[in-house]
Structures are given as structure tokens and as C-alpha cells.
Amino acid sequence: MPYPDHALDVPEQTAVAAAAASAPSVLNSQPWLFSTGPQGVEVHADPRRAPTATASARRDVYLSCGAALFTVRAALARLDRAVRVSVLPEAGDPLLVARVTVTGDGGDPEAAALYRWVGDRRTNRHPFRPEPVPAGVLALLGGAAEHEGATLRRLDAEPEYQRVLTLIRRASLAEDDAVREDRADRLTGVPPAVPVENLGPVPRRDGTDGGAVRDLAPDLALPGRGTAAFEPHPELAVLETAEDGPASWVAAGQALQRLLLEATGHGIAASFANQPLEDAELREEVSSSAAHFGHPQMVLRMGYPLTRPPAAPRRPQHHPHYPAA
């Protein structure tokens, strides 16, 4: 039986999978697998690749896969394909995160427009310029999150702002040895999960930085990093969902990638300050300290970058074809 005219050919399938693989993930773990076919793409979780020592490990896998899922949608929209998205479509297969089925021609123009920033987006752990992100841009980022069923809440008032900064510092100091050892193994592997040029400099602990920048390698002497003072008052926001569970984590991941691509288009970079979200008790404190009423999924540090790091390396993608429906 011949495929319809809107079916994906093999080069298109390969391009979509490659784009999806560029999505952000915890420690660049890329905990996903993609199955492609003429009729669409499936996103599968691959928890074997994810850090396992934190309380947030399972949530992080679904968040990362959600970011990849939005990138699949943007890539297919760029190819002018309309799609139907089913999240967690098989009750008996929790690792099947989403099935994206091509239904015809006519891609989502907003998602297609965001695709142009897929290759430019970076997780930026370097210092940002001190000027704040304009309120109008933050409103656009909030709208991007809401489009995917999440809420981006800016931390712009005291004492909530300082409380969350304090929680970030507390979580960094209280990290379990197993967490640090797992991360060190990943950072010193061949190849490293996050190369030195993507780690950013060691934060200068002289009171000049705002404490939101996460040093991923505090116990490692890695040549070439250097030290730097970071912005004294980092722009912080919390990405939240009304519910908490795999479907909400996938939604948060889609919202994250959508707002990050929107931010990239406005010259804004981001890194993540999720330290307190990796501990169940501190995660609850983030929610209450920020005077929020949803479930915090990500803490973002945003700003205008002084340095644009290279793209973090991606592992080769094996994307077997799945049978036609």
C-alpha cells in the first residue's frame, strides 16, 4: 500500500531525529531514543543514560524527553506537516513517551518559526551581562510556557527571591556523595558528558556572584576552566505545572524547550539551578518560598550572555523504523 503524499521520506526522518537529539537534557544525558517511519516519530525514554543518584532522576528523564518531543513537533512543522501528538499513549509501556503522527500537510506556523533557533540554543553556564531581561520578553516566555500547559513565574520580589537563592546554595552544599561521584564519572568519561568549554568558569566565591550558577565539577581539577565573577542579581524563574506526574513532566519539558527557543530568538540564554529540586523536601520549600501554588519542575537562570559556548556533543542516533499503522 503506497504512503500518502505527506509521508516522511528517509532524509526527513533522519533530519527530525537529529533535531530532536539537540534538545536540552540533564547533564547532557540525552535519555531518549527515537523511532521513525513514514507516518511519524515515537519518542522513547532511555533511563539507562540518566543520572540515577538524585530524587529527581525519573522526573528528569520525562522532562528531557518532553523537550525532545517539542523539538520533533517544531521540526515537522518546519517540514510543513500537520501532526497529532499522543503523550504516554500505551498504558503498558511507560517508556513510550509520545507518538507523533503525521496527519497531512500544513504545519503549525508558530512551531515552525521557532525551529530556526534549534541549532543556536545553548545551555550557558558562563556569566551573563548585568542588565535585566525586559518585561516584554519575559511575558513572551511566559506565554510560551502557558501554550504547553505550564507556568513560568519570575522571581522578582523579596523575600522570595533571596529565599530561593538560599535554597539553591543549601542544596549545593548538601549534595550527597553519590550524586557528586556519579556526576564526576560522567564529566571525566570519554567523551565527557559536558566538555570543559560547556561547563563554564568556576564561580568566584568572593561575594560578587548571586549564587545561582551551578558548578558541576567542584571536586575536579579540569584545566582550562578559569574563574569568573557572575552577575550579582541573576534573573530567576520557576517553571511549574498544576499537576505532578509523568504527563506533567513531559508537558514541562515541552514548555521548557518552547520558551528556550523563544528566548534564543531574543538573544537570551539560560542555565538551570535545579539543585533544590533534586531533593524532595527542598523541592517543597521552593514552591512555598516562591509563593507559588503549582509543582516546580525547573529553576531557570536567564540573561544576556557574554560568551556563547559551542554546542554540546550529541551521541549518534539510532532511530529504527516502526511499522506503518
Task: Kindly label every feature range from the protein language model.
Residues M1-A325:
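Acidic, surface-exposed loops and disordered segments
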